[in-house]
């Protein structure tokens, strides 16, 4: 009888905890009568915005360019194609504000989300400069000073260096009235740290900064994404079968997209695999694993850490990488942080603990700055899958009226929705008023 009472108490406590969390989440929503059509957060994350609900955006002169960030650096031969950093621009003919776009985790400068943002801002009269995420392999080989990304401050320094060098190439060709920066997902997180760095460097003196669906803690978010792989039908014992099916779909997707693992991959793989809704978390987890595997292998080769390939082994452009890819695909991002990232940086900072490294890769580390500056605004979704319970409240508390929080949209699923695009542009043209 006592055990039954205990079980009942636990159930009631669980229900109250769930209701409390739901009520707290609802209380931070700032947008009412929101008509984004998808209410399931996993479906929204994968499917994005149905075409009929998307903002109407024009074709723009989106031009790919390259720049040598470290002229004296020797790139490993296996990455012979990664010596120069690739980026994209869309430039106006007259004096205009310039906006830098930072892509999300594993995505390139020309991925779907950055392209759509570029169209929206170019249409609004901005010069646009689009760069890849620091976690994109081309950025690791061409623009990361250490070759091991994930340190919030060091990544910001890398991005800032890229901005400076790109601006040095553009300065004689265009007239700029103000500088601005935005990014989505990890790119939004990066934008916050870049803005803080600019307060001391003062090269750009950014007028406005917009964070779109950023994580609060990188470690918390990657832990959530890593755990999603446990949703594979049949559990981890069926990883190989699910992964092979995904890779077959990926092969077909890749033929149609230069940025398959980036923005559009989830939706195309979802359609190709005809997955049920309950398998979407597994799809998200595995696709994130593919993205992180590329980063981990690239970093391991660049710094010769010996995490995936044997230390001292030199790979060239003709090397068979199959076995290394298979190993990398089995490694989670949290494994990277504990077994690669932390030991690598502990060599130069031996007094810093593992927990201190983890707490340093969080927006809470710069919370005082985020509270005090008026130039930074945030757009987020109350049901974002990369936020732990209670983390959405961080944005409402820290940013106050500078936070726009939608009730639905998952992780970046509503970025192309017409209302979101209008607000995104307004954040840079009239103070972000919805």
Give, region by region, the residue ranges found by the protein language model:
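N-terminal cap/lid segment of alpha/beta-hydrolase-fold proteins
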Residues: 31, 36-94
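Short, surface-exposed "cap/lid" segments of acyl-processing enzymes
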Residues: 91-136
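Alpha/beta-hydrolase active-site loop
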Residues: 148-171
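Alpha/beta-hydrolase-fold enzymes
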Residues: 197-320
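Conserved alpha/beta-hydrolase "acid-adjacent" motif
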Residues: 385-391
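Catalytic histidine-centered segment of alpha/beta-hydrolase-like enzymes
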Residues: 409-420
